[in-house]
């Protein structure tokens, strides 16, 4: 059985993703601040829900080893939320990213998935935006998302 570690697993995307992974037979560990409440994730034999902060490197070093996959969803999402507290947004969306990637790599994680944002492409005239397009982020939120993509590219390999 594959073991999946998800940051932000009780958030908007994670609350939908986690039940699907559990239905598919994955063993899932969620690390989340649980700001929407701990009731978001239903009890399941293959679910370990941990209330915690991705900025806590000691906690990451304790939780990540033994998993096969990391799915990184945790962030202060969207521009308005980010702009309410830019320092908090930067600490979660950017500053915590490289340590998470490094801890994952050192823990022999086989795959690392990062949920970026289409906002990294800025405003395009083309009707279809795709990954080969130049990044043109316009706000701190999208700039930090783009920065994280670049950081992850530094660690990219066939076994990560």
Regions found by a protein language model. Give the residues of each.
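Rossmann-fold NAD(P)-dependent oxidoreductase module
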Residues: 16-20, 103, 151
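Conserved catalytic-core motifs of eukaryotic protein kinase domains, centered on the activation segment
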Residues: 40-42, 80-87, 123-127
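Active-site-adjacent segment of SDR/Rossmann-fold oxidoreductases
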Residues: 140, 151-160
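N-terminal Rossmann/SDR dinucleotide-binding element
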Residues: 1-69
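NAD(P)H-binding glycine-rich loop region in Rossmannoid oxidoreductase-like domains
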Residues: 54-92
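Active-site helix of classical SDR
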Residues: 144-147
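Conserved Rossmann-fold NAD(P)-dependent oxidoreductase catalytic core, especially the SDR/UDP-sugar
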Residues: 72, 98-139, 154
């Amino acid at each position: 059985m594959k073991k999946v570690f998800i940051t932000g697993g009780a958030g908007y995307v994670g609350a939908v993703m986690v039940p699907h992974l559990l239905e598919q037979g994955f063993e899932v560990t969620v690390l989340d601040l649980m700001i929407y409440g701990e009731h978001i994730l239903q009890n399941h034999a293959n679910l370990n829900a941990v209330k915690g902060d991705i900025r806590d490197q000691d906690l990451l070093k304790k939780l990540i080893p033994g998993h096969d996959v990391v799915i990184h969803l945790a962030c202060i999402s969207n521009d308005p939320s980010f702009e309410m507290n830019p320092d908090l947004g930067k600490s979660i969306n950017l500053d915590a990213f490289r340590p998470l990637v490094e801890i994952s790599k050192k823990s022999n994680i086989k795959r690392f998935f990062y949920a970026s944002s289409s906002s990294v492409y800025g405003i395009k005239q083309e009707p279809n935006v795709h990954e080969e397009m130049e990044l043109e982020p316009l706000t701190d939120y999208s700039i930090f998302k783009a920065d994280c993509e670049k950081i992850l590219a530094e660690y990219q390999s066939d076994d990560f």
